[in-house]
Amino acid sequence: SKNNPEKKMFVHINSGHFEIIVVQNQKLVLFNSFDYTTPEDFLYYILFTAEQLGLNPEEFPLELIGKIDAESEYYQLAYKYIRNVSLLDVSDLQAKNNFSYTTNLF
C-alpha cells in the first residue's frame, strides 16, 4: 500500500562490500555502502544502521539481494538476529518488470 509507515531495509550484497537501502512510504530514507570481510562485519553494519534509524530487529523487514542464498553464513547470521529476513528473488523481479539485459550496447 502507498501509505505504509513501516521502514523496510534492503541489503544488496557484492563480494567485499554491500549497500544498505532503507525506504518508507516509497521514499528513500537512507542509502549507504559498507566494506566487509566477515559475516560479523556484515551483521554489525546492518544492526548499527537499524539502531541509528530506530528500527527494532524484532520488527523491521530485511530483504537481502545479490551474492547470497539461504545456505550462506551471512544469511544464517542475519536470520539469527533479525526476525523478518527474506531473500529477494531478482529473477522474479526481472520477469515481472520485463527488464531486459539483452539491449544492444554497441
Q: Model regions: which residues?
A:
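Hydrophobic/aromatic-enriched cytosolic interaction surfaces used to assemble or bind macromolecules
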Residues: 1-106
